[in-house]
């Protein structure tokens, strides 16, 4: 199902940067950039809004497109990502902000939240100072789009890219009241996803430009130190993927979606890992043509929901995949 296509709106250049989560009531929420004057990223576009749609029937039908972050022209919000806090039933939707008129090239890191499954949203909250380090003020930094993760103890975890100072984990131990940033960056790494492993350690899976592969990074001390390796079975051209845990119907394993090509953004696949990311299955091809960023979630009926960019950023599809199409037990 094609959820966002700029061909149907003459005022929009393209929709990019998909994010999807499942709320505790089973609702699916998708968010994406609405890029108005051009398809350029935040640094190069002065009018990007964030819009959403919602499904209450596992993706069969969707609400109309609705704008949830919209600053005046000259100010842009981009790169949505979400975490659903199971403790407080709160959706956190993170985004990156730039004022092209007064502070061009300066990145701010913000979120809005919803306590009613996306019906209403808070005003933006600026957490730049909480999740930045000294001397980062003018760095090229941004919260990774897609989604974050909630650990077993309730800690909210997510990834932040700083092109000058490395990719860091950030999060909250008090359900979003305050935020922290990890001591040490993962290297190498661009847009990254974090998951908690069964032993409580953190695993970050990273896009690494110009390498042809993804990298994984594991920390057993909450981001103070990292053990990193090139994942030779996970080829990648340098594109944002999605890493989630499937924990439903007595099944518990990891899922990864990414582009299965070392040079071009084409052939979107899903792999699974039954050993906490030590090894990965052969890829299951979801889309053979041009594709790019993807975001995954587990639906209330046990299916996998995948929201992804396709066809040179013209289309943004949602597809539902049954578990037995990917994995055999």
Protein language model regions, located:
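Asp-box/BNR beta-propeller blade signature and adjacent active/binding-site loops
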Residues: 1-329
């Amino acid at each position: 199902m094609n959820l966002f296509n700029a061909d149907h709106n003459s005022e929009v250049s393209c929709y990019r940067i998909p994010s999807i989560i499942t709320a505790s009531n089973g609702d699916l929420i998708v968010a994406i950039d609405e890029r108005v004057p051009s398809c350029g990223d935040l640094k190069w576009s002065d009018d990007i809004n964030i819009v959403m749609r919602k499904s209450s029937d596992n993706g069969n039908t969707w609400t109309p497109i609705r704008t949830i972050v919209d600053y005046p022209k000259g100010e842009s919000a981009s790169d949505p990502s979400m975490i659903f806090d199971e403790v407080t039933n709160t959706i956190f939707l993170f985004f990156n902000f730039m004022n092209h008129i007064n502070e061009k090239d300066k990145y701010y890191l913000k979120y809005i939240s919803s306590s009613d499954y996306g019906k209403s949203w808070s005003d933006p909250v600026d957490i730049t100072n909480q999740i930045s380090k000294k001397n980062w003020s003018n760095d090229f930094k941004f919260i990774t789009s897609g989604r974050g993760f909630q650990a077993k103890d309730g800690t909210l975890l997510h990834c932040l890219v700083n092109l000058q100072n490395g990719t860091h984990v950030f999060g909250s131990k008090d359900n979003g009241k305050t935020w922290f940033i990890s001591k040490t960056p993962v290297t190498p790494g661009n847009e990254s996803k974090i998951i908690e492993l069964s032993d409580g350690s953190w695993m970050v899976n990273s896009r690494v430009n110009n390498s042809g592969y993804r990298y994984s990074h594991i920390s057993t001390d909450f981001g103070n130190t990292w053990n990193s390796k090139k994942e030779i079975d996970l080829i990648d051209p340098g594109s944002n993927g999605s890493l989630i845990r499937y924990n439903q119907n007595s099944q518990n394993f990891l899922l990864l979606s990414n582009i299965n090509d070392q040079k071009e953004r084409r052939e979107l696949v899903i792999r699974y890992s039954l050993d906490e990311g030590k090894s990965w299955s052969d890829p299951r091809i979801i889309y053979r043509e041009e594709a790019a960023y993807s975001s995954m979630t587990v639906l209330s009926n046990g299916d996998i929901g995948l929201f992804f960019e396709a066809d040179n950023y013209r289309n943004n599809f949602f597809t539902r995949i049954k578990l037995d199409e990917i994995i055999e037990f």
